[in-house]
């Protein structure tokens, strides 16, 4: 089973990202679940959302404490939240930032990867909403989910131009994190 923890701020779409990742996993023929972890937080407060993906039914119902993968939607969270907490040594942490991975100095043995998802979102979607963009980066970095499945899940959730722009941004982030585009 693969476990993913998404760090964001209230209103950034962390829960939607976890749900779309779960739907994409289902599209790939896998079992999945997605759920948030927040209380009475307001817009802008740190939140977490989780996705589990497995080839067999998932019976576990607890929060994710030792993720294989971590997605950080807002790099300012690195100052206040230990995003690397519990991540497996062979895991991957994907951070939305203009910085290079080495400059982040995260206390982890996991591989740290960065992508400027905000720029991709602004250039293609026209708004700084990075949740879907980072799912493309996740697909490219991990190979756990087909990028086409993520695009299909997004198009099913957001119709018309919004869905298409998001699908294009997903493809761009997928290529960026794999080093296929500059």
UniProtKB/Swiss-Prot annotation:
Its EC number is 1.2.7.1. Keywords: Oxidoreductase. It holds the Pfam family POR. The gene is porC. It also catalyzes the oxidation of 2-oxobutyrate. It comes from Methanosarcina barkeri (strain Fusaro / DSM 804). It catalyses: 2 oxidized [2Fe-2S]-[ferredoxin] + pyruvate + CoA = 2 reduced [2Fe-2S]-[ferredoxin] + acetyl-CoA + CO2 + H(+). Transmembrane segments: none annotated. NCBIfam families: PorC_KorC, PorC_Meth_Thtga, PRK08534.1. One of its GO terms (molecular function) is pyruvate synthase activity. InterPro entries: Oxidoreductase_gamma_subunit, PorC_KorC, Pyruvate_synthase_PorC, Pyrv/ketoisovalerate_OxRed_cat, Pyrv_flavodox_OxRed_cen. It comes from the Archaea. Heterotetramer of one alpha, one beta, one delta and one gamma chain. This is Pyruvate synthase subunit PorC.
């Amino acid at each position: 089973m693969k476990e993913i923890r998404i760090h964001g701020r209230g209103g950034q779409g962390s829960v939607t990202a976890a749900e779309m990742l779960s739907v994409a996993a289902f599209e790939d023929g896998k079992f999945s679940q997605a759920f948030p972890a927040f209380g009475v937080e307001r817009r802008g407060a740190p939140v977490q959302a989780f996705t589990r993906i497995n080839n067999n039914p998932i019976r576990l119902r607890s929060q994710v404490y030792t993720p294989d993968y971590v997605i950080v939607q807002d790099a300012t969270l690195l100052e206040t939240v230990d995003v690397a907490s519990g991540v497996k040594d062979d895991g991957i942490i994907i951070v939305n930032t203009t910085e290079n991975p080495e400059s982040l100095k995260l206390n982890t043995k996991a591989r740290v990867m960065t992508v400027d998802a905000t720029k991709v979102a602004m250039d293609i979607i026209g708004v700084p909403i990075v949740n879907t963009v980072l799912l493309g980066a996740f697909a490219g970095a991990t190979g756990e989910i087909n990028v086409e499945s993520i695009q299909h899940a997004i198009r099913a959730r957001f119709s018309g131009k919004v869905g298409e722009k998001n699908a294009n941004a997903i493809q761009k982030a997928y290529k960026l994190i794999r080093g296929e585009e500059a």
